[in-house]
């Protein structure tokens, strides 16, 4: 028979545990900034926006080439156009790297030793560069798009979506210590 204990404050359960793990583990509520109820849908939407941006890059090139439509962008607009897609690709690669690392760590308890520490360090350093750099590129891209007089409202809206996506990825990276420079997990 299992016994469960809970701490109740003002009629709400704020933490609980059960007999087998009670001496060393207690389940607390997640803080608002780590709550997966709103973070996971936002993360999925953010990664989807970045994935669409990356996948539609070659599609737009093929369509323009097929119908002979030139890409009429100034030099800075072209750089922003390319850099936001590269930043999106790198962000997706980093997310996949973290998923693979967590899967490897979950596969065997032997992987929770120092065996995977170099990979954790590598991903933490790369996450700092990619997530912060991705937000900087997204902000620059949005600034360039909003400054352009000939840009359509869809491009302006999508630039804001990409800024929110980059901010979300950086927020999750900071909240869940993907950018922490430590292997204390």
Language model regions located:
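Peripheral terminal and inter-domain segments
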Residues: 1-185
């Amino acid at each position: 028979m299992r016994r469960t204990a809970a701490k109740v404050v003002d009629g709400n359960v704020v933490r609980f545990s059960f007999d087998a793990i009670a001496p060393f583990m207690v389940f607390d509520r997640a803080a608002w900034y780590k709550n997966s109820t709103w973070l996971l849908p936002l993360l999925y939407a953010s990664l989807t926006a970045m994935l669409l941006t990356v996948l539609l890059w070659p599609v737009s090139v093929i369509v323009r080439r097929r119908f002979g439509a030139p890409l009429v962008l100034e030099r800075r607009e072209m750089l922003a156009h390319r850099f936001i897609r590269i930043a999106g690709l790198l962000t997706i690669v980093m997310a996949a790297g973290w998923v693979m690392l967590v899967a490897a760590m979950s596969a065997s308890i032997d992987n929770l030793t120092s065996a995977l520490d170099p990979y954790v360090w590598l991903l933490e350093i790369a996450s700092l560069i990619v997530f912060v750099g991705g937000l900087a590129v997204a902000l620059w891209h949005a600034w360039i798009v909003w400054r352009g007089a000939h840009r359509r409202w869809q491009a302006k809206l999508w630039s804001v979506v990409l800024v929110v996506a980059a901010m979300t990825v950086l927020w999750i990276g900071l909240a869940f210590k993907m950018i922490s420079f430590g292997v204390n997990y």
